[in-house]
UniProtKB/Swiss-Prot annotation:
Subunit field text: Component of the PAM complex, at least composed of mtHsp70, MGE1, TIM44, PAM16, PAM17 and PAM18.
One Pfam family matching this protein: GrpE
Gene Ontology CC terms: PAM complex, Tim23 associated import motor
Alphabetized PROSITE patterns for the sequence: GRPE (PS01071)
BP GO terms, sorted: protein import into mitochondrial matrix; protein refolding
Name of the encoding gene: mge1
Protein name: GrpE protein homolog, mitochondrial
Matches recorded under HAMAP family: GrpE
Gene3D superfamilies for the chain: 3.90.20.20, Head domain of nucleotide exchange factor GrpE
Transmembrane segments: none
Species per Swiss-Prot/TrEMBL record: Eremothecium gossypii (strain ATCC 10895 / CBS 109.51 / FGSC 9923 / NRRL Y-1056) (Yeast)
Length: 212
């Protein structure tokens, strides 16, 4: 029994001598290269579906992450809008309650004015008791006004000012030869503002233009 020969050498048989070994070696290298290429191609073919699947999963996850981010940003924006709306509503409710309370206080302040205006100068001169009482009421009225001013309730300076429909309510008009037409010459009821906003316009008499 002769020596074992590889399959590539078997057709040559006993003629595989040193003279034809280079040719045989070249053939072996070609077969080996072809076999490697075939194996690589088979591996790539087997890997392609898996790579494609992973790429698809990655794309899906990326889209899902983008959607979640968009939803989160929208939720944050909605929450901030809700906070702002709530803050404005609370402020409006607070301002409305404070405005109603302020108007009620103004009625008390008006009563001080009515009481002081009901006493004539002659009565003050005739009776020291009435004069003392009048001074006490005036002092109380002044303290009350200072307290209101400390909390943002301020009187409107109307007398002698040009008529402003945002600040004044004209109750009558009269010609006044020594005054400028369109200005306030009489304050029937003082007006007030709360933190710069008019809560009660001043009721005033306005100088009428005689040529109008």
């Amino acid at each position: 029994m002769g020596p074992y020969l590889p399959a590539i050498l078997r057709p040559i048989g006993r003629y595989a001598t040193l003279y034809n070994v280079p040719r045989v070696a070249g053939q072996l290298r070609c077969y080996a290269a072809d076999a490697k290429d075939a194996a690589d191609a088979q591996g790539e073919s087997a890997a392609d579906p898996r790579v494609a699947e992973l790429e698809k999963q990655l794309a899906d996850k990326s889209k899902e992450a983008a959607d979640l981010k968009d939803r989160l940003l929208r939720s944050v924006a909605d929450f901030r809008n809700l906070q702002e709306v709530t803050r404005r509503d609370v402020q409006k409710a607070r301002d409305f309650a404070l405005q109603r309370f302020s108007k009620d206080l103004l009625e008390s302040l008006d009563n001080f004015g009515h009481a002081l205006g009901a006493v004539s100068p002659e009565a003050l001169q005739r009776s020291p008791e009435i004069a003392d009482l009048h001074a006490g009421v005036r002092l109380t009225r002044d303290v009350f006004e200072k307290t209101l001013l400390k909390h943002g309730i301020a009187p409107i300076d109307a007398l002698g000012q040009p008529f402003d429909p945002n600040l004044h309510e004209a109750t009558f008009e009269l010609p006044q030869p020594d005054k400028t037409p369109g200005t306030v010459f009489h304050v029937q009821q003082p007006g007030y503002t709360l933190n710069g906003r008019v809560i009660r316009p001043a009721k005033v008499g306005v100088v009428k233009d005689p040529d109008a």
